[in-house]
A protein has these predicted regions:
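Helix-turn-helix DNA-binding elements, focusing on the entry/boundary residues of the two helices
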Residues: 18, 45-48
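DNA major-groove recognition helix of helix-turn-helix
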Residues: 36, 47, 66
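Hydrophobic micro-packing sites on short alpha-helices
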Residues: 47-52, 62-63
Length: 69
């Protein structure tokens, strides 16, 4: 099983930059960048809440579970 972070697609859809999201959420730009490029193996739940609020979306819009084949 894998969890994909769809932050890059959502930001592109909204024409928002990583820097814009960092400013709106107060999350460090490096953390946003790691999530954007799917380089993190864990995510702070508070950050997910802040991101969903800033992007006006649900958790399922930025996270997806890919089952094992």
């Amino acid at each position: 099983m894998a969890i994909r972070i769809l932050l890059s697609a959502k930001l592109g859809e909204l024409r928002m930059t990583q820097a814009d999201l960092a400013r709106k959420t107060g999350i460090r730009p490096n953390t946003i960048n790691e999530m954007y490029h799917e380089l993190c193996d864990r995510v702070n739940l508070e950050y997910l809440d802040k991101i969903c609020t800033a992007l006006n979306c649900d958790l399922t819009d930025i996270l997806v579970r890919i089952p094992d084949e």
